[in-house]
Amino acid sequence: MARKTNTRKRRVKKNIESGIAHIRSTFNNTIVTITDTRGNAIGWSSAGALGFKGSKKSTPFAAQMAAETAAKSAIENGMKTLEVTVKGPGAGREAAIRSLQAAGLEVTAIVDVTPVPHNGCRPPKRRRV
């Protein structure tokens, strides 16, 4: 019986000119997802996925590294321009945006989409350290 050769499908490079970078920056982590204009994910990265543990995940440097990794996957797919949406109060917001620009992507717009409650749920009690 003839042996089947191990053939693997090659990843098809999508040629997407522009997209949206969603930066979710919390107090504990920063997640960067790059999508096309419809919202289909092209690449993502986070501080935790890059090996940062504990309180190091919430640093601006970790956010910068996460944005660089996500930008590389976007550039591989032919992306040149980005809209940036930022959500959350974390430390890595500005660092992630600067890192996307430094990676060679042109940022056309920056939008803050942090959800603000109209006096909804009661916030957690204050920490006493």
Swiss-Prot record:
Keywords, alphabetical: Ribonucleoprotein, Ribosomal protein, RNA-binding, rRNA-binding
Keyword RNA-binding attributed: yes
GO biological process: translation
Pfam family, one: Ribosomal_S11
Any GO CC annotation of this UniProt entry: ribonucleoprotein complex
Gene Ontology molecular function terms on file: rRNA binding; structural constituent of ribosome
Keyword Signal assigned: no
Family: Belongs to the universal ribosomal protein uS11 family.
Function according to Swiss-Prot or TrEMBL: Located on the platform of the 30S subunit, it bridges several disparate RNA helices of the 16S rRNA. Forms part of the Shine-Dalgarno cleft in the 70S ribosome.
Subunit note: Part of the 30S ribosomal subunit. Interacts with proteins S7 and S18. Binds to IF-3.
Protein's recorded name: Small ribosomal subunit protein uS11
Species this protein is from: Oceanobacillus iheyensis (strain DSM 14371 / CIP 107618 / JCM 11309 / KCTC 3954 / HTE831)
